[in-house]
Swiss-Prot record:
Protein's recorded name: Glutamate-1-semialdehyde 2,1-aminomutase
Major localization class: cytoplasm
Source organism (scientific name): Saccharophagus degradans (strain 2-40 / ATCC 43961 / DSM 17024)
Subunit structure: Homodimer.
Gene this chain is encoded by: hemL
Annotated InterPro entries: 4pyrrol_synth_GluAld_NH2Trfase, Aminotrans_3, Aminotrans_3_PPA_site, PyrdxlP-dep_Trfase, PyrdxlP-dep_Trfase_major, PyrdxlP-dep_Trfase_small
Family in the record: Belongs to the class-III pyridoxal-phosphate-dependent aminotransferase family. HemL subfamily.
């Protein structure tokens, strides 16, 4: 065991501050990172890795972008946190509302978990209903209401997926199969008048990378509208990754509430939830639904977010990045086929994922669970040795940044070829 990991385990549970970082899913010990720049991570031994985790999505410009660092450095001179309104909060809020379809107002928080938790509380308060629908394999943070897995039948209420989550909360959560349109219609036919909201990752990035099938998001929109339920698109991951307007712009489906995070914070701890004036004015202090946060709207985080979003508004930003994502994902699939290894890839926007399976298309959680995870683990460690860092779990999406060059893609494809020859 490395000294760094041994030291960490003495004072931090499991040696990490988020479980996936511990490498338990893939085996071995986590890599401790010292610095990062552009598309590269450097560990404490100064080994360089081409990074496709990108801090789990936020670093769409690449690590330590000069403009973002300059904005943060400038803002730091005036203080770290005030606990009072600042003009930069309004500046970023206005920009996001002008970008995201149907968003009139937005509330900043400090994490994606806070954003989804608050969005659900708002939906329940606004509708006067308690039940929510979520989808198996979608992750919306670690709040109690959302750590619920599917029950024994399609429409049974869920059961807690973690000790410490009261069973009474599970009674209000219905967990359905992602991309199952008929199941959604059945649920609304049976209990539509009890449903406060549906929350969904428009592209499921926490069971690797699963785009919605044609008609799935549209059905959610239609059923919510008919039942008077709110549709929450959890764009913490997809926001600004499928284009400037996120998944809702990419797929043309307008939610009632959007949650954001990751990219929007430029690498700082930021989350947000927003929607129409009518819905958002139901939040305190204008409305009865309480939500608050000591560090919400932190000025340094706002500066990082504003600097990031301003660069994303460049009309030429996304096209080359989408093309590189396609080249990388399809290139790895081609190499796997040449090596006789069953592999399917999904990609959309700047997100991508690989599945070691005979299936030609992977569209739901059950298919993801049936993949060859031991082979993925070997692939992960092989790439790590080659100097390529992908997510240390087969259920997590990969990402690209504007800092990744054609040479980085070529390097990665050669690394994948080398690994396929060994596994």
């Amino acid at each position: 065991m490395s000294q760094a990991f041994e030291n960490a385990q003495q004072y931090i549970p499991g040696g990490v501050n988020s479980p996936v970082r511990a490498f338990k899913a893939v085996g071995g010990e986590p890599v401790f990172i010292k610095r990062a720049k552009g598309a590269y991570l450097y560990d404490i031994n100064d080994k360089r890795y081409v990074d496709y985790v990108l801090s789990w999505g936020p670093m769409i410009l690449g690590h330590a972008d000069d403009d973002v660092l300059a904005a943060v450095t400038e803002k730091l001179q005036y203080g770290l946190s005030f606990g009072a309104p600042t003009e930069i909060e309004t500046e970023l809020a206005k920009k996001i509302c002008n970008i995201m379809p149907g968003m009139d107002k937005v509330r900043f928080v400090s994490s994606g978990t806070e954003a989804t938790m608050s969005a659900i509380r708002l939906a329940r308060g606004y509708t006067g209903r308690d039940k929510i629908i979520k989808f198996e394999g979608c992750y919306h943070g670690h709040s109690d209401s959302l750590l619920i897995k599917a029950g024994s039948g399609a429409l049974t209420f869920g059961v807690p997926s973690s000790p410490g989550v009261p069973a009474c909360l599970a009674e209000h959560t219905v967990t359905l199969t992602y991309n199952n349109i008929e199941q959604v219609k059945q649920a609304f036919a049976e209990i539509g008048d009890q449903i406060a909201c549906v929350i969904v990752e428009p592209v499921a990035g926490n069971m690797n990378c699963i785009p919605p099938i044609a008609g799935f998001l549209e059905t959610l929109r239609e059923e919510c509208t008919k039942a008077g339920s709110l549709l929450i698109l959890d764009e913490v991951m997809t926001g600004f990754r499928l284009g400037i307007t996120g998944a809702q712009g990419y797929y043309g489906v307008q939610p009632d509430i959007t949650t954001l995070g990751k990219v929007m914070g430029g690498g700082m701890p930021v989350g947000a939830f927003g929607g129409s004036k009518e819905v958002m004015d139901y939040i305190a202090p204008t409305g009865p639904v309480y939500q608050a946060g000591t560090l919400s709207g932190n000025p340094v985080a706002m500066a990082a977010g504003l600097a990031t979003v301003q660069k994303l508004e460049n009309p030429d930003f996304y096209a080359p990045l989408f093309a590189k994502t396609k080249t990388l994902c399809e290139g790895i699939q081609t190499l796997a086929k040449e090596a006789g290894i069953p592999l399917t890839g999904n990609y959309v926007g700047t997100m991508w994922g690989l599945f070691f399976t005979e299936e030609e298309k992977v569209t739901n959680y059950q298919q993801v669970m049936a993949c060859d995870i031991p082979r993925f683990n070997k692939f992960f460690h092989g790439l790590l040795e080659e100097g390529v860092y992908i997510a240390p779990a087969s259920y997590e999406a990969g990402f690209l940044s504007a800092a990744h060059t054609d040479a980085d893609i070529d390097f990665t494809l050669q690394a994948a070829k080398n690994v396929f020859a060994r596994i």
